[in-house]
Amino acid sequence: MRFVYPQGKAKALTFSYDDAQNFDRELVPIFNKYGMKATFHLNSGTLDGGIFIQKAEVAELYKGHEIAAHGVQHKNPTMLNKHQLVLEFGEDRKELEKLTGYMVQGLSYAFGAYS
């Protein structure tokens, strides 16, 4: 058995970006120009604030790329109890699904922290 990526490719390169900061407005068009895809890990609770992308632009800006949950407020998961974890990631997923119109399947822990 041999594992292959789309179009029969044997190797893959991934691009992964966190937090939906304003510079994504410049980054995403570069990916689009060269036909490249990326995963963007968004915090639904920080959207619309200061240095972050606006909720109203999420669906169009990230169209064709993967959106993944990253926690509503980017809290360190090692500092949360089970109930708080479910809320932090479950509510983020629900809100991102409303914004994108499709099922969000990916998840990236804030700070890369886990226990």
Task: Please give the residue ranges for each predicted region.
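N-terminal pre-catalytic segment of deacetylase/amide-hydrolase enzymes
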Residues: 1-15, 22, 52-53
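Generic enzyme active-site microenvironment
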Residues: 14-17, 68
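Short, well-ordered alpha-helical segments enriched in acidic and aromatic residues
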Residues: 27-31
